[in-house]
């Protein structure tokens, strides 16, 4: 299991969070920190975490030639998520599992890139919709129980997130 110090994850949120394309009234730094809280206990459990839907026989694997190629190239790691934001390799062409596993800055930039291209595409109106998109891949009026719990935990993490001082963050 890989991990990053919480203070470093929060510093990355302070550095990159302000460029997240978020709904009016929400704070990108706090959203980024909340996602890291939900996905990895803010860097404590960064995986890699196997995601069966992305592996041989899974729904994503079955429907995606690109995902099948990643599994063929990297085996189980091609179907795993990495880092404080649990990034799936398929969403980061050109990155290897090792790069997402050991480089916090690459992970943070990857989080912002995925958020601003994929999540923002769905035009979420609130934190619940952001949670649904990040966890489920889309918005829905009838989310499964696990997604409801994920969004509730995301809201709690957001409500308790404190913006980090910007001094000393490069």
Model-found features: residue ranges?
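Catalytic glycan-binding domains that act on GlcNAc-containing polysaccharides
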Residues: 2-169
């Amino acid at each position: 299991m890989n991990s990053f110090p919480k203070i470093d994850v929060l510093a990355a949120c302070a550095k990159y969070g302000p460029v997240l394309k978020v709904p009016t009234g929400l704070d990108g730094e706090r959203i980024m920190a909340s996602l890291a809280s939900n996905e990895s206990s803010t860097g404590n459990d960064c995986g890699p975490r196997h995601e069966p839907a992305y592996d041989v026989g899974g729904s994503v694997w079955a429907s995606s030639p690109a995902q099948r190629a990643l599994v063929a190239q990297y085996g189980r790691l091609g179907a795993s998520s990495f880092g404080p934001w649990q990034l799936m390799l398929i969403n980061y062409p050109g990155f290897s599992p090792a790069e997402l596993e050991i480089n916090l800055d690459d992970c943070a930039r990857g989080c912002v890139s995925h958020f601003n291209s994929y999540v923002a595409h769905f035009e979420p109106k609130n934190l619940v919709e952001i949670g649904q998109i990040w966890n489920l891949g889309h918005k829905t009026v009838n989310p499964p129980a696990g997604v409801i719990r994920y969004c509730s935990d995301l809201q709690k993490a957001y409500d308790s997130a404190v913006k980090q001082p910007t001094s000393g963050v490069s």
